[in-house]
Amino acid sequence: MSSVFSRRNFLAGGAGLAASAFVRGVKAEEQTPDQMLNELIEENQDSSLDSGFDNASRNVKLPKKSLPTLSHSTAQTTEASVAQYEAIVAKGGWPEVSAVAEGARVGVKSAAVPALRQRLATAGDLELNSGAPDVFDSYVDAAVRRFQVRHGLRPDGIVRDATLRALNVPADMRLAQLKINAGRLKTLTENLGNRLVVANIPAAQIEAIENGVAVTRNTAVAGKPDRPSPDINSKIIQINFNPFWTVPVSIVRKDLIPKMQAEPDYLTKNHIRIYDAKNNEQPPSQIDWYSTEAVNYKFKQDAGNFNSLGSIRINFPSPYGVYMHDTPAKNLFGEDFRFASSGCMRVQNVRELVYWILQETPGWSREEIDEVIKSGERKDAKVAKPVPLHWVYVTAWATPDGVVQFRDDIYSCDGFGTQVNAVKG
């Protein structure tokens, strides 16, 4: 479909076809989940849409972009939401949604829709008596989108596999998640300053928070389940522009050696150089790749648009040797499952985050940052006032606007493993 949907039609029902429609001239399937969420929030909050479409779409309650995951208010409302979910569990929870509903979208009539409606209504995503019971109409579309937003899934209004799995996590497990995370949030929010950066690992999301407001929110790619991103409390002290990448020994052992065995010109193609203990460059042919000899050398990737760190690296002290950085593999930001790194955090639109970090550092205006990146020159910026940084593990939280959110327990820290996980890697 090539026509541009109006704002009104986007939420009024036509948005159920977002996978093939254009919204504001941008293909929905080319947008990241956060971009789609921002579109949806903006549509929902536009007061000019009050007339002419159904109440279910108009009243869809979505999280406010300005509310941070980590705040005293969030800790309090998460604690309060426990009672809400205790009441749901006491009444028997919610029904299981049949696999027949998978792929359901606007316009579908199915015997599986009544259970879907009941499930969405129980958690507050839908008014139960809205619309025909067995029809997936715009009421259900709006409710599915809200549910997807609350669970960190692409808000396209279609009941795909990940959405179906999230729908069928039992209410008592969601309650247990809330209880665990209410305690976590109480501890995490004890000593927050006015200006900080928070990376929520299970959400694969980074927020810059100033005076209790999330001023930027960046989609991230976090560590693989077998190479998890660690919990961190540190301070951002330096920004590297157009950085080199020194490959960690763990990656040399786990990745580079097997790649060189399979593809002998891998290092050359990826602009990675080898240096011995005296900093003399060595050719790849000098190393026995069928041994562990390679771990005794330093591997350094040249700066450039091919570099694994992209154009920016954000530095902070930590015992784990991790950092936040740009990436040339930007396609991963559009995935529901964004756990593909070796522990570092890859940051979408990292330049926006860096603008904010360097706001109080003289000599690093937006224009100056853009210019140095464009030049390709290696430069470092020392942050004038180091910014507190927290990498946290929060899988359930409720913001003061009353929206309860859940994420997969990707590293099994809650003790549920894959039982609460909707997205597969």
PLM regions and their residue ranges:
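Short low-complexity, flexible loop/linker segments enriched in glycine and/or proline
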Residues: 3-5, 172-173
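Well-ordered beta-sheet/strand-loop patches within structured domains
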Residues: 29-128, 132-154, 161-425
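N-terminal export signals
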Residues: 2-3, 9-28
